[in-house]
Amino acid sequence: METDIVIIGAGPIGIFTAFQAGMLDMRCHVIDVLDQAGGQCTALYSEKPIYDIPGYPVITAQKLIEQLMEQASPFEPVYHLSQKVEKISNNEGENFTIITNIGTEVKCKAVIIAAGNGMFEPNRPPLSGILEYENKSVFYSVNKISDFQDKTIVIAGGGDSAADWTVELSKVAKKIYVIHRRKEFRCTPETRNKLESLENDGKIELVVPYQLHELAGGNGQLRAVIVKNIASKEEREISADFLLPFFGLSMNLGPINNWGIELEHGRIIVDPATLRTSRDRIYAIGDIATYPDKLKLILNGFAESAMACYHIYKVIHNSPVNFQYSTSKGIHRN
C-alpha cells in the first residue's frame, strides 16, 4: 500500500488531519491501536461535554468524533485500527515504510504523529478482587450516561474527571458518593461550587477524607464499597451499584521511544512553525508534541494539523501551496 501521509493516531486531531490533508489533495492512511476511531474521546469520555469548539456551545466527545469522521469522509482516508506502529523505516531514500504489529506495511512520503498522550490505561486502585468487577460494576470511564439511571454510584478521586462526572451523572443517578483523600478538590472553582450545591440538595455526598478500602459483592455485581477514614481509620460501608475510580491514566510512549525522534519529558520536540520533529518528514501535533509556551488545547491541535499539512505539501511538491479558502475550493473526493 502507498499513500502520501501516514497519520499515527485516530483521535480528534488525527481525524481532522485526514480532512486537512485531503483539502490539499494528499491521500492519508490512519493507524490507531484502539479498535475504533476517536482516541480518548471515544474510549474514555464519549458522553463528556466539550465547551470550547467554535460554533458549538456544547458538544459531546462522541458527537465531535462523528462530525470529524463525516468531515473527513469525502477524502476516503484508510483506517487501520487495532494496530500499533512498530517501526518507521526510510531505507528507500526519502519515502518511509510504516510497519505495524500485525505486519501491515504502508509506504508514504511523510508521517504525522497525532498520538495524544501515547498509549494509556487507567490507574487501577489496589483493591482485592477488583478484576472480578471490572466492566460489570466497576468502570474507569463512562460510555453511556443512561446506564447509570436511578443507580447509586461511588465515584473515587479528587481531580477534574471525578468532579466533572459527578456533576454530569447527578442528573440521572439516584445518589452519588464522592470519595477523596482530602477535603480540597483539584477542579475549577465553578465545578467545586456545583459540587457544594449538589451536596446541599442531597444529590451527592462528599465522603472526605476517606480512601477506598474493600469491595463487597459477588459474580461481578457490586453490593457495597467499604471506605476508610484517613485520620481515624474508621471504616464505613456504602451500598452501591457502581464504582467509578478516576485516578488518572498511566501513559506510555511505547514504540515511539525507538523511532529516533528527539523527546523531552515524554513529549516529542517539534519546530513550532512547522511541527517538524528531529527527523525529516516526520511531524508531531496535538498533546504528543511540545515546544515553548505550547497550549494543550484541542483548538491548538487543529491549528497544528493545518500547519503540518501545509509544510508537508511544500516539502513533497518542492513548492508552496496555491492557497485557496475552503469556500472557494469546495470539497472534492479523491
From Swiss-Prot:
Substrates-to-products reaction catalysed: 2 reduced [2Fe-2S]-[ferredoxin] + NADP(+) + H(+) = 2 oxidized [2Fe-2S]-[ferredoxin] + NADPH
Annotated coiled-coil segments of the chain: none
EC number per UniProt: 1.18.1.2
NADP is among the record's keywords: yes
InterPro entries in alphabetical order: FAD/NAD-bd_sf, FAD/NAD-binding_dom, Fd--NADP_Rdtase_type_2, Ferredoxin-NADP_redctase_2
Binding site for FAD: D32, Q40, Y45, V85, F120, D287, T327
Similarity annotation: Belongs to the ferredoxin--NADP reductase type 2 family.
Protein name: Ferredoxin--NADP reductase
Organism: Wolbachia pipientis subsp. Culex pipiens (strain wPip)
